Amino acid sequence: MSSVVVVGTQWGDEGKGKITDFLSENAEAIARYQGGNNAGHTIKFDGVTYKLHLIPSGIFYKEKISVIGNGMVVDPKALVEELKYLHDKGVDTSNLRISNRAHIILPYHIRIDEADEERKGANKIGTTKKGIGPAYMDKAARVGIRIIDLLDKETFKEKLEHNLGEKNRLLERFYELEGFKLEDILEEYYDYGQQFKEYVCDTSVVLNDALDDGKRVLFEGAQGVMLDIDQGTYPFVTSSNPIAGGVTIGSGVGPSKINHVVGVAKAYTTRVGDGPFPTELFDSIGDTIREVGHEYGTTTGRPRRVGWFDSVVVRHARRVSGLTDLSLTLLDVLTGIETLKICVAYKLDGKTITEFPASLKDLARCEPVYEELPGWTEDITGVTSLDDLPVNCRHYMERIAQLTGVQVSMFSVGPDRAQTHVIKSVWRLA
């Protein structure tokens, strides 16, 4: 039995999809455990670029099981569209398994999400307006509708009818928007469920059976630790738990069955949406990194905010997710920058702090304390091992490992799978 969890250590968009895809080669089951179609990941497979939002990146290996876990919120319409997108590209999806316990996103969740962001104005969270938050709210309020409910028309109608009474009052009286009619949703969404019912099962059983049979299971997180609802920059967070602890809740696999946790970190830092960002760059270096790194959201197309590598953030991720390994991505983007900076601590009201503050008011006042390192000019996109990297690049990686307290076990120097390199296997048994 061997299991690996892949988590983002920053604010998402760290390259988790690419690393998950790479590690999938040695896994026999790949599972997502939280989030929904608010997270996009881009994967290159056999020279073709794919953009996925819901379906795990292991879908391209037809002999491996790909799991949408119970902790996810699934937009049935988006799922059907994504399946069609894959089928149109000739991808076999018979290896997909969808948890019957996962909650679904309905049109009223999306409308409420949009209206709420609009209402907040300058205080908006910066959501993707995909209905994720409102769906998780319904789950916590015990009025959510699950996949298993969607497949039973009578149950679906009963729950939908009950929810529409409340949602329409909210939309019409509070947001002054038009509500929904039962018939607007019932037939269309029941039909979506029928289109993917062949994949629906108890995925906790599937995953535990795989682990008990000695198979390798990979758990794929969405977003990142700093977007975790408990450990992130609240309230500028997502509505679920991307940290490694979210695996046990969102997949139905106990913590004793988790072996390694791989934290994926960019060689710099990015963020989409609002909220404090201590190392953010507003100069030409920031613009260069954004353009060279193609730092635009997979889901929204929004330009990402760019900053220097922040070891305070990644240390926080190490602690709350129990990181055993680090995978450093997009090193090639930093090529040509004469002097690189790493944030080693923050200055808050004249005092040096080395741990990430819980208060956003404090975080907004934090000034980064930087350590400067010489950059490199050599093209590193074609390297095949750690030894091929320029000395300054290796020093940069070593310093990140020292400052974060996590060994760098993998690094990536480009978008293709062949540009991801292993220093130490994360599938090791010890």
From Swiss-Prot:
Keywords: Cytoplasm, GTP-binding, Ligase, Magnesium, Metal-binding, Nucleotide-binding, Purine biosynthesis. SUPFAM superfamilies: P-loop containing nucleoside triphosphate hydrolases. It is found in: Cytoplasm. Pathway: Purine metabolism; AMP biosynthesis via de novo pathway; AMP from IMP: step 1/2. Its cofactor is Mg(2+). IMP binds at residues 13-16, 38-41, 128, 142, 223, 238, 302. Its EC number is 6.3.4.4. Pfam families: Adenylsucc_synt (PF00709). One of its GO terms (molecular function) is magnesium ion binding. It is an enzyme of class 6 (ligase). GTP binds at residues 12-18, 40-42, 304, 330-332, 412-414. It comes from the Bacteria. GO terms for biological process: 'de novo' AMP biosynthetic process; IMP metabolic process. The keyword GTP-binding applies. It catalyses: IMP + L-aspartate + GTP = N(6)-(1,2-dicarboxyethyl)-AMP + GDP + phosphate + 2 H(+). Binds 1 Mg(2+) ion per subunit. PROSITE patterns: ADENYLOSUCCIN_SYN_1, ADENYLOSUCCIN_SYN_2. Mg(2+) binds at residues 13, 40. Coiled coil: none annotated. The active site is at 13 (proton acceptor), 41 (proton donor). CDD domains: AdSS. This is Adenylosuccinate synthetase. It comes from Listeria monocytogenes serotype 4a (strain HCC23). The lineage of its organism: Bacteria, Bacillati, Bacillota, Bacilli, Bacillales. The gene is purA.
